[in-house]
């Protein structure tokens, strides 16, 4: 996510050629956030994944499987998580060419899209990463309250 000019912790993601931060989330099948982390964009995906997987494991000790994309299949992360936490990481693979909706992966992308509807979350305006995480929590709370009031 691009950051504003207000300063704060940010990094350069060479893969996306973006200066900003990375957001990591673990969601359930309804798209509700169990854990989230915001890191500078130059940190590796494995570092952010470890943060959110540990936080999720503390809350849901009966968790058996986490679905992830291929970025999290590097440096032995799935093996490490399986051995230390007893959680299986299944890598959802993309097809070689074209577009295909990947059902498990789509839940995460849909949640990010819902969060980006908030003006404060469409771009990272916060100076500190803990403030950015708090704004994501507030966005999730707003979304859950909107669901409750509709029914």
Residue ranges of model-derived segments:
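Polybasic low-complexity intrinsically disordered regions
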Residues: 1-86, 93, 139
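Basic, amphipathic alpha-helical segments enriched in Lys/Arg and hydrophobic/aromatic residues
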Residues: 79-80, 84-86, 98-151
